[in-house]
Every structure is written in C-alpha cells, then in structure tokens.
From Swiss-Prot:
Recorded coiled-coil stretches: 390-524
Positions bound to ATP 2: G605, P606, T607, G608, V609, G610, K611, T612
Signal peptide limits: none
Primary localisation category: cytoplasm
Residues annotated to bind ATP 1: G205, E206, P207, G208, V209, G210, K211, T212
Organism: Chlamydia muridarum (strain MoPn / Nigg)
Protein name per UniProt: Chaperone protein ClpB
Similarity remark: Belongs to the ClpA/ClpB family.
C-alpha cells in the first residue's frame, strides 16, 4: 500500500526538505517527526495532546538529535530515505491494514513511533505512560467509527474543533458580552431544544435585533447552570463557514468537511448543540452541476433528532431560501425575534454599559443611553435596535478615548503662542540697534511666562491622564474579580466566594468611587472622559447629515431672524416667507410632528415672482449652499411610466438595480429641501407616490425598501390659477388678504388636484404679482451680485438712482415677473463691463460708477485702493 493521506504526504515532503537544507545524507524518522510536530493541528499532534504528552519536550529532543546528524559537503546527492524510516513506514502500513484503512494517516505513524526503540522518541514515550494498546483504543474512540478511505479523511477528524467555535468555553472564560433581556426568546429556544424530534429552533428576525445574542445567552445560561436538566453540561458550537470553505480545493471536499462536523455532533449523543448563523448560506452551498447542496446533508439528521441545531437568519433570506425548500423548512421550528421596544433597548444598553466603559476607559451617562436609543430610532431608520444604539455608544466612547490620547486644546494653543513668540524674538535679535534691546528683554520675559504656563498645563494633563488610566485599570480588576466570583461559585469554592464578595470586591468598588470623585472635583479639567447626550447627537449628525445636536446660540439667533434673511433675497412675498420660517423653527426645536415631513408647501403664483428663488434661499440658509437643494423639473414626469424614475424601475426592467432619483437622493441626504418645480405638469401617477410621502414621511422604492422622508422639507411650485390671482390683485391693489386670495384660486386647484392630495399639503401659499417697489428692490439685489463678482477682481462697482430707475422700468413685465430683469441686467450692464475688462478700460484696483446717458448705461472709472 502506497496510499498516503494529504497530511502524511505533506509531512514526508517537508522531511526531505529538512534533510536537504541541513545537508544530511539520509532522511531519518527524526526528520519526519520534526515535520509532523511543526503542524500542531494535525491528527498526530492532537492524539499526543489527548494522552497529555509534552509536545515542547519532544520537539527539543528531536532538534538535539538532528543537530548531531553528520553533514555532507556541497553538491552531494539528494538525501535518501534511511532504512529505519522505511521500516517505520512499513510498520505504519501494517497498522493501517489492521484498522481496515485504505490510506496511511498520522495516527498510524504515531502507533508505529510508539513501538519504535529509536531515540529520542523511545525515551520521551516513557514520560507519557500510555501503552500501545491503550493508544489504539483512544484513536478508535477518537475516530467515532470513521475510516481513512480518502486522502482528506484525516483532515476531517475532529471536525467540530476545526470548523466550529465552542461558545460554552468562551462563556466560561468570560469572553462573551452579557445578554440582557430576550428571556422569552431564550426560554422558547430551550423549549424547542428539549423536544424528542425536530428539536431545532430557527431564530428569524431583522439584522441587528439580537439573534446571535440569543445563542450567546443560551451558552451563558448553560455555564451558569440556569437550564433544565436536559441541557445541563451541553456544549454549544457555532459553525465557522469561512473555515469550512477555506482551502476546499476539490469537488466534494466541502461536503466531506461538513459531514465530519455533523458526525461529531451526532457522535456526542446529544452533548453538543450546533449553532449555524446565517443558515441560508448552506442552501445551495457546494451544489455544482446538479450536485446536492449542503442543506440536504442536514435534513436526515435534523429529521431523526440526532442533530441538535439552532439556525439564525433574516426574514428576507428565510422567505427567499428556506421557505422554498419545504423539506428543510418543516425540520426547523421558527422563533420570531422582534425589534425591542425603546424601554427594552435602554435596558439592554444599561447591561452593556460597564463592558464599554472598561474597554474605552470612559464614563457613559444615563442620558447618553437614552439619547442613543431615541435618536437612533428617529433618525437611523434603515437599521434596527439595539444594534444601531450600541454602535452609537461605541463610536461616541471611541471618540472620547481618542481625545484623551490627543493634545488638549489649551496646551495646543499655548504651544502655538510660544512658537510665535520665539519666531518674533529671533527676528528682533537680528536687529543690532540698541532701541530693540529693551523689546528683546520683554520678549524673553513673555517666553518664560508662557513656558511656565505650558509646563503647569502639561503637569495637569499628565495627572489627569494618570487618574483616568488608574481608574480604567481598577475597573478592569473589578471585572476580573467578579468573573472569579462567578467561577468560584460554579466550582462550589464558597470560602473564595465569601472573600471576593464581602472583602475584595467592596474594597475595590470603594477605591473606584473615590477615584471618580477625585477626578470630578478637579477644577479646570483638560480632559473630558464622559459620554453624554450631546456627544451622541454629534455622532448621529456625522452618520446621517441631520443636525440633531442641541441648537447653538448662533443658530438660534439665525432662526429667529429667518424672515429677514429670506427677505434679503425674496421680495414681496410675506405670506410664504412667514409660513416657511415658522415650519423650520418648530422642526429645529423638535416640536413638529415626528411622523411627517418637516413641511409640505405648495407655492402658487405667476412666473417670475420668486417661488423657485425662495426654495434656493432656504437651501442656502439651511446648508450654506444652493446646490444642497434636490430639484425635480416635473416636465420630465409627464408620462405615466415616468413614476419609475422617482422610485426605481420594477423587477425585470432596465435600471432596476440603479434605484430611483428621489429615493436614492433622500437615502443619501435625508435632511434636504426637495423642490418639485411646476408640479401641475406631472402625470397623475406621480401624485399617488407623493401621497405616501406627505402623509407618513415614508417612501417605498421599487425594491420594497423604506426611505425616511421625515427630515425633508417638500416644496411644490405651480402656475395654476395665476391669471385669476393676477386679476384679483390688480383690482384690490398691493395689500391683499391671504385667505381671500386662496378662495380665488381654490376652484382651479380642485379641478386639477384630488381632494386627498390637497388635504396632505401643510399650507398653500399664494405668491402675488410684484409691484414697482418690489422691482426696485430686486434691481438692487441683482446689481449687488454683479458688484460682488467684480470685487473678487479688486474692482469697486457703484451706480446711481437713474440706473435703478431705467432697469426697473425696462425690466418689468407683469406677465413674466422679474425674469426679464435678469436678462436686461445681463445685456445692458454685464456685457458692457465684460468688454471694458477685455479692452483694459477697467483694471484691478479701479472704482467703477454706472450712470445713464441718453437711455444707455455708461461707466466712469477712477483709480482707487480696493481690498
């Protein structure tokens, strides 16, 4: 028989390489032994560990023996197998035949080594005190009835240890986070596991609601003994799909590995429970060219009840993969894991707070926990509690931890001040005049003073860092003592429990309390080690782009004078400006309805009166740039099918994967001004989509994903009823009543929009035609924009009243509003100035004054210092 397992073939190759590298003429059994010991995960080493053999001692003895081997000169022949190695392999083959195996594996080699009289193995074997017969019995037991019938069979022994992680051991070592809440789901899981057949729970829930945590909670309960007798002393293994797939080169190798895991679970006779996270990945795994997938390997064992298995998957994957396979579905008992309530999520965070405080070395306030849950629930709508709230706490704590390690702002400012003084002193030293000597002395005194202040600040910083580091160390020690107390209670070491519970732990808790008080009582602290609600709000703002931080004084002042700011750009529309300003103010202080958008407005009026300009002005005030506005020209949505442009194409159509222009824009920038320009041009189907957005603040796209629209401000513009509006204003004059104006345009609105659409609009705002006084103000606004562009070239621009009068008279048209005015300024002013700049008549540093000469705008220049 010359069939070797993959592991033995690899070991023989390495043995030849070792002999060649060491310039040995023969490959001996010691070279083979050395190569086998270099793979601690091999069957050879695993069996030695099971008989409590000292691998380190054996490795040292083999190294010494190889050093004593004679070497040959350069260019000698390739080393040949020694007679003793050949005899060892023959003995191993005999062991393989006696055990009915087709392939020679590591355990056969170990049995052959066990009978050898060659040193150093013979001397080392005496330290183990295990007979060859006992070793053979152990190997047979270890194999659990499997035979070496393939080259990879050796790799698949001990499949549980190789391809799974033991959660029970991790729980016993204190490496799992505490599982708070979820008692009902854990009890239901235990109930299903206690059944005679089909004892396989399937945890189904959205990502981040705590499915994996339920499995970890079960492992913690098993360790604590808080389970029924049927589950006591059980081991919970989690399947590592990465390890299972990695390195599976040949067809059938993946299935063989999975089979070895299942065999290990079955052979334990109920002592092992297998947890498969993302169980849907097994459906279809390994299935090529009509071969069975991995899920089919599970079915027989699941049906018999010999395999205790807990699965976990999301609702979508369960419907997509598991429900399609009815035979697999009926072998699992579904347990639905719902998202916890806000109160339960806060309760979960309280349980995890200590772990995060110890890891980051910070203090997390109760307010921060509440803020993390409430703000994540309101603003991060595409994820689920408690995962998103835990992530907020973790990121906020890491931000504080990073700041503790960075240079505090007061020290940074002092260092900059010191650098500036030293540079100034060096400049003064270069001046030889006696008059500068006194100034140099004063400068030296200032440098000495700043150095003293900097030294004092650094000393305070070092002290605070030391206190925080000491506090973190004490909290770590406290956690270790609490873990030791639990361990002692499990092993019934009650003397140790009493010592820890009533002496060591209270003493350390008192030290921590005193250290925290000492840290809090320090005046003028340089380091902030507390995570509060303001920091949580900052992290939410960084994630979503929604400014949810508590309003700063500057922002409050800006919102109070919002009307004045808007009136600087939009003239003659007091109704619209007041209504929009009130909506934004109520939203920013948190008093608006959280289940609806910030505001839904319909701007009605003739063209060129400032409807679109007001939307642009809002975007600039809220986001500091006009481009932040999401604008849709509704003339592009006149066909019935064009609704797919907004929410995405349906499945099977071109562009399905790309998403919709509205849904994707709001997903990326949920806090936006959304403008639907000329809404009356859109098809009726578009209005049906908008109903859902305006009422619930939710948009469902073509992929059934919900997009949060509750932080957006929606503005629609329309020309409906503009003629009636113009006629009414012409009769009544400039001062008009808003309700009276709306009553004029109401019939036209009802003819075009459905009642349910009108009912969802917060306010319909009429834009009245502009008066002559309004046009004069607009001339000033437009001319100021031209002047600002020239100021960038260091050119000052002024104009007299005659220019304003000419432009306002020539640029106003009742039918077109203020738009012709912009074109007139472009033709009469901007074009003239552009030509003068190109000719060199106007240069940088000049002042330009515009005036009228025979109905033509002309300019005068004079040289002036313009900054």
């Amino acid at each position: 028989m010359e069939k070797f397992s993959d592991a033995v073939s690899e070991a023989l190759e390495k043995a030849f390489e070792l002999a060649k590298d060491a310039k040995h003429s023969y490959v001996t059994e010691n070279h083979l032994l050395k190569s086998l010991l270099q793979n601690p995960g091999s069957l050879f080493c695993l069996v030695i560990k099971d008989v409590h053999g000292n691998l380190g001692l054996l490795t040292s003895a083999v190294d010494d023996a190889l050093h004593r081997e004679p070497t040959v000169v350069e260019g000698a022949a390739i080393p040949k197998p020694s007679p003793s190695l050949q005899q060892l392999l023959l003995n191993a083959q005999e062991e393989a035949r006696s055990m009915g195996d087709e392939y020679l594996s590591g355990d056969h080699l170990l049995l052959a080594f066990w009978k050898t009289t060659k040193e150093p193995f013979a001397s080392w074997r005496k330290t183990v005190k295990t007979s060859p017969e006992a070793l053979k019995e152990l190997i047979i037991k270890l194999r659990q009835g499997s035979r070496m019938d393939s080259p990879s069979a050796e790799e698949n022994l001990k499949g549980l240890e190789k391809y799974c992680k033991n959660l029970t051991i991790l729980a016993r070592e204190g490496k799992l986070d505490p599982v708070i809440g979820r008692d009902e789901e854990i009890r239901r899981t235990i109930q299903v596991l206690s059944r005679r057949t089909k004892n396989n729970p399937m945890l189904i829930g959205e990502p981040g609601v705590g499915k994996t945590a339920i499995a970890e909670g079960l492992a913690l309960r098993i360790v604590q003994g808080d389970v029924p007798e049927s589950l006591k002393d059980k081991h919970l293994y989690v399947l590592d799909m990465g390890a299972l797939i990695a390195g599976a080169k040949y067809r059938g190798e993946f299935e063989e590995r999975l089979k070895s895991v299942l065999k290990g679970v079955e052979a334990s006779e109920g002592a092992c429970i297998l947890f498969i996270d993302e169980v849907h990945t097994l459906v279809g795994a390994g299935a090529t060219d009509g071969a069975m997938d991995a899920a089919n390997l599970l079915k027989p064992a699941l049906a018999r009840g010999t395999l205790h298995c807990i699965g976990a998957t999301t609702l979508n994957e369960y419907q997509k993969y598991i429900e399609k396979d009815a035979a697999l579905e009926r072998r699992f008992q579904p347990i639905f894991v719902t998202e916890p309530s806000l109160e339960d999520a806060v309760f979960i965070l309280r349980g995890l707070r200590e772990k995060y405080e110890i890891f980051h070395g910070v203090r997390i306030t109760e307010g921060a926990l509440n803020a993390a849950v409430v703000l994540s629930y309101r603003y991060i709508t595409d994820r689920f509690l408690p995962d998103k709230a835990i992530d907020l706490i973790d990121e906020a704590a890491s931000l504080i931890r990073m700041q503790i390690g960075s240079l505090p702002l007061p020290i940074d400012e002092k260092e900059r001040e010191l650098s500036a003084l030293i540079v100034k002193q060096e400049a003064i030293k270069r001046e030889q005049a006696p008059a500068y000597q006194e100034e140099a002395n004063e400068m030296q005194k200032a440098i000495d003073r700043v150095k003293e202040e900097l030294a004092a600040l650094r000393l305070r910083w070092d002290e605070e860092k030391g206190l925080i580091a000491g506090l973190k160390e004490k909290k770590n020690s406290l956690e270790n003592l609490k873990f030791a107390e639990e361990e002692a209670e499990r092993t019934a070491d009650y003397n140790r429990v009493a010592e820890l519970r009533y002496s060591l732990i209270p003493s350390l808790e008192k030290e921590i309390r005193l250290a925290e008080e000492a840290l809090n009582q320090r005046d003028g602290r340089l380091l902030q080690e507390e995570v509060d609600e303001r920091l949580i709000a900052q992290v939410v703002a960084n994630w979503t782009g929604i400014p949810v931080q508590k309003m700063l004084e500057g922002e409050s002042e800006k919102l109070l004078v919002l009307e004045e700011s808007l009136e600087e750009r939009v003239v003659g529309q007091p109704f619209a400006i007041t209504a929009v300003s009130d909506s934004i103010r109520s939203a920013r202080v948190g008093l608006s309805d959280p289940q609806r958008p910030l505001g839904v407005f319909l701007f009605l009026g003739p063209t060129g009166v400032g409807k679109t300009e007001l939307a642009k002005a809002l975007a600039e005030l809220l986001f500091n740039k006009e481009e932040a506005m999401i604008r849709f020209d509704m003339t592009e949505y006149m066909e019935k099918h064009s609704v797919s442009k907004l929410i995405g194409s349906p499945p099977g159509y071109v562009g399905y994967e790309e998403g919709g222009s509205l849904s994707e824009a709001l997903r990326r920038r949920p806090y936006s001004v959304v403008l639907f320009d000329e809404i009356e041009k859109a098809d009726k189907e578009v209005f049906n989509i908008l109903l859902q957005i305006f009422d619930d603040g939710i948009l469902t796209d073509s992929k059934k994903r919900k997009v949060n629209c509750k932080n957006a401000l929606f503005i629609m513009t329309s020309n409906i009823g503009s003629q009636e509006l113009a006629d009414y204003c012409a009769k009544k004059g400039t001062i008009v009543d808003k309700e009276a104006v709306l009553s004029v345009v109401a019939p036209a609105l009802k003819n075009y929009f459905s009642p349910e659409f009108i009912n969802r609009i917060d306010e319909i705002l009429p834009f009245v035609p502009l008066t002559t006084e309004d046009i004069v103000k607009i001339v000033g606004i437009q001319m100021n924009r031209v002047a600002l562009r020239l100021l960038e070239r260091r050119i000052s621009l002024t104009w007299d009243d005659s220019v304003v009068l000419f432009l306002s008279e020539q640029g106003y048209d009742g039918a077109f509003g203020a738009r012709p005015l912009k074109r007139l300024i472009q033709q009469k002013v901007v074009t003239m100035l552009s030509k003068a700049l190109l000719k060199g008549d106007i240069k940088s540093g000049m002042s330009v004054e515009l005036t009228m000469a025979k109905d033509v705008v002309v300019f005068k220049t004079k040289t002036n210092s313009v900054v």
